[in-house]
Regions:
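Nucleotide and nucleotide-moiety/phosphate-recognizing core
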Residues: 1-147
Length: 148
């Protein structure tokens, strides 16, 4: 079992999608549940969002800041981390597997702080491992209103 904590982000406006992505159904199962189950190799799992949905039973942490940006979720995850490393995921990855997490984890080096995949020449910042030591840099970027 990986000692990292997992934080799944269920926020955003889902403008193009039309409804909250985490509530979408794939193969008779909520997308969030697909991701949650793929993360069962980790010791601690949490969901992060602006407000806890009604009848929500998974461990939930409210966004630490009043802003709409993924950096808020990452900041919240790192502030609440129970381990040095966190796996930060968006809620729109229903096909993610433990093998992908293992591959990412094995690719980290001793001197790295972030491990994120690259797909179609784009970095996937809401699917990666982040070390707690980046928190001061993250706080600095938030103070400067650099949210990307």
């Amino acid at each position: 079992m990986n000692k990292s904590s997992v934080f799944i982000l269920i926020g955003g406006k889902s403008k193009r999608f039309g409804s909250p992505k985490w509530q979408a159904i794939l193969n008779d199962k909520l997308i969030l549940d697909h991701i949650w189950d793929a993360c069962d190799i980790f010791e601690n799992r949490f969901v992060i969002g602006k407000e806890k949905p009604k009848y929500f039973e998974k461990p939930f942490i409210r966004d630490a800041l009043e802003m709409n940006a993924p950096i808020n979720g990452l900041y919240t995850a790192l502030k609440n981390a129970q381990s040095d490393w966190v796996l930060f995921l968006s809620c729109d990855l229903p096909l993610i597997t433990p093998k992908i997490f293992e591959k990412l984890w094995k690719s980290k080096t001793d001197n790295c702080d972030i491990v994120i995949p690259k797909a179609n020449n784009k970095t996937q910042v809401t699917c990666g491992f982040y070390h707690k030591r980046i928190l001061p840099k993250l706080e600095s970027e938030i103070q400067k209103k650099h949210y990307s």
